[in-house]
Amino acid sequence: MAFNHKHILGIEQMSAEDITLILDTAESFKDVSLRSIKKVPTLRGKTVINVFFEASTRTRTSFEIAGKRLSADTVNISASTSAVVKGETLEDTAKNLEAMKPDIIVMRHSCSGAPHYLAERCDFSVINAGDGAHEHPSQALLDLLTIRQKKGHIEGLTVAIIGDITHSRVARSNVYALNKLGAEVRLCGPGTMLPPGIERLGAQVFDRIDDAVSGADVVMMLRIQQERQGKTMLPSLREYSMFYGLTPDRMKLAKPDAIVMHPGPMNRGVEISSAVADGPQNVILDQVENGVAVRMALLYLVSGGEKLEDSAQ
């Protein structure tokens, strides 16, 4: 099956077949990270610029490693080192980047729709590494890959996503992706962190974490994004932990073989206890590991890759 997308802007625009192709391609690339020499010549001669206007550790580093393992020339630009701090507009930034003739731009931005804006105005491929509270497609894809590896399938699973749904681009991308692949999605959080009309995304909404977690195959905890919310949304971290934190007792309500996920960074003792975060059901580091393979797959596919078997030799 051919991948017919020049850009990766969101999961909402993808089909189930697109998602499956990305996951299958990522599986094939996982072997590269296990080699003594972790590099293949797949994207030799290609230039990838990682433009991050928001702080990031996992996503930026993961994309950088992914590009280098594919032999691409990778360049990193952060907000603090860009001309944006001097007043340059996003449109002017786009024009200047295009003048340098990159092949792929990986962008994270605090404004929803910024990667779309770039894609509409430039010839290079754009990969959305997170835009505001809109979407974070590569995170959802690595989450799906982790679930598929641990459970063997996604269709028919019950996935509970707990936390700050309003500000979570991870939640939105996961809801889109899980629905397309046939999972049942549950959302839970304080009323102030559940956006109006969230049911329209195709998820059940719960007020109590105990109800949301009960019988779940996967429990995904979300970070409290204090940088995006007002003080009135969260009375105290202690109160949040009491009513919505994931503890060993609450995990007992899920299925015995349930897995625990978190996109990171974690606030230990707030959304998740250390006992759960370090426990046997946690697959958080598996998510991080799978992030490199998924991002290798995205860079490869938007570059027009067709026969992975040939490129990975």
Swiss-Prot record:
Tell me the InterPro entries matching this sequence: Asp/Orn_carbamoyltranf_P-bd, Asp/Orn_carbamoylTrfase, Asp/Orn_carbamoylTrfase_sf, Asp_carbamoyltransf, Asp_carbamoyltransf_Asp/Orn-bd
PROSITE patterns linked: CARBAMOYLTRANSFERASE (PS00097)
Function in brief: Catalyzes the condensation of carbamoyl phosphate and aspartate to form carbamoyl aspartate and inorganic phosphate, the committed step in the de novo pyrimidine nucleotide biosynthesis pathway.
Name it: Aspartate carbamoyltransferase catalytic subunit
Please name the GO terms that the record assigns under molecular function.
amino acid binding; aspartate carbamoyltransferase activity
**In which domain of life is the source organism classified?**
Bacteria
Q: Which residues form the signal peptide?
A: none
* Organism, as annotated: Syntrophotalea carbinolica (strain DSM 2380 / NBRC 103641 / GraBd1) (Pelobacter carbinolicus)
Pfam families, A to Z:
OTCace, OTCace_N
Which Gene3D superfamilies does the entry mention? Aspartate/ornithine carbamoyltransferase (3.40.50.1370)
NCBIfam families xrefs: asp_carb_tr, PRK00856.1
UniProt catalytic activity: carbamoyl phosphate + L-aspartate = N-carbamoyl-L-aspartate + phosphate + H(+)
Known EC number: 2.1.3.2
Family that this chain belongs to: Belongs to the aspartate/ornithine carbamoyltransferase superfamily. ATCase family.
Quaternary data: Heterododecamer (2C3:3R2) of six catalytic PyrB chains organized as two trimers (C3), and six regulatory PyrI chains organized as three dimers (R2).
